[in-house]
């Protein structure tokens, strides 16, 4: 597995490179945004670890350009920017995970391995798929097991958010912030979140044996393929 690290702090970059190499990965390190973007566009990587506050091209712009170019490799944002606004922005731009500095290497390694083994979710420029649930981002058509599912615009956005973060526990507060940011139709009221998820679940899960949308009691929700 080949990983690209885009990190301008030399000590942090060397620390990450050494640790990931010892864990068995092939690692490239770019110490500026332009070089990192060029490498990500021209070479094949299984994962990109990307800082946001880079001296030339920032991480926000890099991930935006990568996704616009159809690059679908997992991206883990590693940054000192830790507010919920920053987290939501990163995830919405196309990041697959977000880790705030300072961090424990053991946690970063666990997140890296999780991202690399997500073989059940396929993400291309226009299609999202989990198990037998398919979402076409261009036509905005949703189907499960070949059956068409009609969603409202808000339900579609919520489903896309869940699929892009398949296997992650999403707190109600994060879902609320995301939906307000996109549609301005929810408050932080957890009941509103529960209602929105219940309506989505009724359409994508109720008529099927395998339930993809799971409740994590006391925390929030998660979209995943249950173990057989």
Curated annotation (Swiss-Prot):
Question: SUPFAM superfamilies recorded for this chain?
Answer: C-terminal effector domain of the bipartite response regulators (SSF46894), CheY-like (SSF52172)
Task: Give the UniProt keywords, A-Z.
Answer: Cytoplasm, DNA-binding, Phosphoprotein, Plasmid, Transcription, Transcription regulation, Two-component regulatory system
Annotated Response regulatory domain ranges read: 2-116
Location in the cell: Cytoplasm
Entry's Gene Ontology molecular function annotations: phosphorelay response regulator activity; transcription cis-regulatory region binding
- What's an example Gene Ontology biological process for this entry? regulation of DNA-templated transcription
In which residue ranges does the UniProt entry place its DNA-binding region annotation? 125-225
User: Which superkingdom is the protein from?
Assistant: Bacteria
Q: Which GO terms describe its cellular component?
A: cytosol; protein-DNA complex
- How does it get modified post-translation? Phosphorylated by SilS.
Entry-linked InterPro entries: CheY-like_superfamily, CusR-like, OmpR/PhoB-type_DNA-bd, Sig_transdc_resp-reg_C-effctor, Sig_transdc_resp-reg_receiver, WalR-like, WH-like_DNA-bd_sf
Which residues are annotated as modified residue 4-aspartylphosphate in the UniProt record? 51
Q: Which Pfam families match?
A: Response_reg, Trans_reg_C
Protein's job:
Component of the sil cation-efflux system that confers resistance to silver. Probable member of a two-component regulatory system SilS/SilR.
| NCBIfam families attached to this UniProt entry | cztR_silR_copR (TIGR01387), PRK09836.1 (NF007346)
Please report the name of this protein according to its UniProt entry. Probable transcriptional regulatory protein SilR
Organism of origin: Salmonella typhimurium
């Amino acid at each position: 597995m080949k990983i690209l690290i885009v990190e301008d702090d030399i000590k942090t970059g060397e620390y990450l490179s050494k640790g990931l190499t010892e864990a068995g990965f092939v690692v490239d390190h770019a110490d500026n945004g332009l070089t990192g973007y060029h490498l990500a566009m021209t070479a094949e990587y299984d994962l990109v670890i990307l800082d946001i506050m880079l001296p030339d091209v920032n991480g926000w712009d890099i991930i935006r350009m990568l996704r616009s170019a159809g690059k679908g490799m997992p991206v883990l944002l590693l940054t000192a920017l830790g507010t919920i606004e920053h987290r939501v922005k990163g995830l919405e731009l196309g990041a697959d995970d977000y880790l705030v500095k300072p961090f424990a290497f053991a946690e970063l390694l666990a997140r890296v391995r999780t991202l690399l083994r997500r073989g059940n979710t396929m993400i291309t420029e226009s299609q999202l798929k989990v198990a037998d649930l398919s979402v076409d981002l261009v036509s905005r058509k949703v189907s499960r097991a070949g059956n068409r599912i009609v969603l409202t615009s808000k339900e579609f956005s919520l489903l896309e958010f869940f699929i892009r973060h398949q296997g992650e526990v999403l707190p109600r507060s994060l879902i609320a912030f995301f939906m307000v940011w996109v549609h301005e139709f929810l408050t932080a009221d957890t009941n509103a979140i529960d209602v929105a998820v219940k309506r989505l679940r009724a359409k994508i899960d109720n008529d099927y044996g395998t339930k993809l949308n799971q409740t994590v009691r006391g925390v929030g929700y998660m979209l995943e393929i249950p173990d057989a």
